[in-house]
C-alpha cells in the first residue's frame, strides 16, 4: 500500500471517528437535557445510547481500519477497543453513573476536551506512527 493510500485511509478513519464522537456527544447532550427537564427515564435512555455507540465503535470502525498497514491498524484498533471495552462494561453493569462518566477522567473540568477527542487529535497528529499511551 502506498503512503498516499494509507494517508487517505487514515483521513477517512479520522473523519469517521469525529462523526461517531459527534453522535456520542449528541446522545449525552440529549441525556443531560432530559435530566434538566426532570425526565429520568429519558436521561437513562440517552446515556444508554451513548454507551451503545461507544461499545460498538471498535467493531464498527473495522472497515475504516482495514486499508491501514498491519502495525498501524493494530495500534488504532487497540486504542478504540479501550473505549469500547469500558462502554461494554458500563452496559453489563447497567450503571448509568458509569455510562455518564465514559470518556472523562476523574479530574475532568467543564470545557476541557474528553478522552476520545484527545485520542482522535493524537491519531490525527501522529498519523501512521500512532501508538497507544
Where are these regions (language model features)?
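Generic structural concept
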Residues: 14-21, 51, 55, 80, ...
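Short amphipathic alpha-helical segments that mediate assembly, nucleic-acid/protein binding
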Residues: 6-10, 28, 58-61, 73-76, ...
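Amphipathic alpha-helical binding modules
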Residues: 81-133
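Short, charged, amphipathic alpha-helical segments
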Residues: 40-52, 74-81, 114-117
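A structural signal for well-ordered alpha-helices, especially hydrophobic packing surfaces
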Residues: 21-28, 54-65, 87-94, 124-127
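Short terminal alpha-helical segments
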Residues: 2-48
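Short, solvent-exposed, charged loop/turn and helix-capping segments
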Residues: 54-82
Amino acid at each position: 500500500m502506498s503512503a498516499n493510500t494509507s494517508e487517505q485511509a487514515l483521513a477517512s478513519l479520522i473523519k469517521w471517528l469525529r462523526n461517531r464522537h459527534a453522535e456520542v456527544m449528541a446522545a449525552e447532550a440529549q441525556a443531560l437535557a432530559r435530566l434538566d427537564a426532570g425526565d429520568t427515564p429519558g436521561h437513562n435512555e440517552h446515556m444508554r445510547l451513548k454507551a451503545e455507540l461507544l461499545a460498538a465503535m471498535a467493531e464498527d470502525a473495522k472497515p475504516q481500519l482495514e486499508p491501514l498497514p498491519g502495525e498501524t491498524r493494530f495500534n488504532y484498533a487497540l486504542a478504540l477497543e479501550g473505549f469500547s471495552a469500558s462502554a461494554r462494561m458500563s452496559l453489563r453493569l447497567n450503571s448509568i453513573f458509569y455510562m455518564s462518566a465514559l470518556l472523562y477522567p476523574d479530574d475532568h473540568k467543564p470545557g476541557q476536551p474528553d478522552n476520545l477527542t484527545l485520542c482522535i487529535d493524537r491519531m490525527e497528529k501522529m498519523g501512521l506512527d500512532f501508538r497507544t499511551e
